[in-house]
């Protein structure tokens, strides 16, 4: 685990475990969300906080209100993965993180997926409900939003045009296109 000394960036490295893969030996998509949550918790611990109010100086909870992940290249059993967290947005009552997943097996890291997670600051109510509240000052004063040049712009577009995906697209054989002619018969281009 590394904390870059900046309260907007964190990275953790881990390996894909056998129990995290499917029958094809590929990491199940749901585990990307587990990796994101685990990185968020490690980020908070590195800053001296906990994401649960019961074990920290924070009197609120931070439930997930939005989660997404775009996949470019599958991860497999025993792949080494770097999970990088950046604070994309710090709102008055929420935090949004960007995640980048890079496979570290080769000589150069390969980005395999990108994720985004938004958490809201809430106070638990006696009736079991939740009430949105401002981020605690201890968090709001410490955690910062990452500089714009570090954030991914065009979130989906860039992960879908990863070098690996572009290489596979170029290597794919061209398919014949069938179009109807004027007389109703199909011709192949």
Name each model-derived stretch.
Residues 183, 187-189:
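Asparagine/serine/threonine-enriched low-complexity, disordered tracts
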Residues 29-41:
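Conserved N-terminal beta-strand and adjoining loop/helix that marks the start
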Residues 15-17:
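Beta-sheet-rich sandwich/jelly-roll-like modules and their strand-loop junctions
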